[in-house]
Amino acid sequence: MKSLNKLCIGFYGTSEFSLSFLKELFSQNIKISYIVTKPPIPSGRGKKVNISPVHEWGLKNKIDVLTPADMKDRKFLDYVKKRKIDFNIIVAYGNILTKEIINIPDYLSINVHASLLPRWRGAAPIQRAILSDDKETGVCIMLSLIHISEPTRLSA
């Protein structure tokens, strides 16, 4: 395995939660080849088109930002396949990755989920834990495998 400062990753994330992970990876001198985030959406009273916090950060740091509407889009897949990456890091992205994307890195695809699985699977685990007055919560780090319902937990 390469040393940390020689690693190259593809990062998939959208939220403020995922941005904290992205910033930490960047601070460790891990090369971020590209960022994949949800497409900009109109919101608010004026229906202004807003980009995600991850998208904004990527642009400020001159990292390629991709916003595919379809994870099976040929142009998107060709782009990410051409980039030699060691890992995919997925943190609160908002879409399920295809088998093809999961298998792109030389090593692994790793998913970070903001709950102690299986308690709050799916979207908004932090909000659901708060609304349920959970006394204990955490983060799970797992391998992303072909069958998303059967992750292999690396850490909790």
Where do the model's predicted regions map?
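One-carbon transfer enzymes
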Residues: 1-149, 153
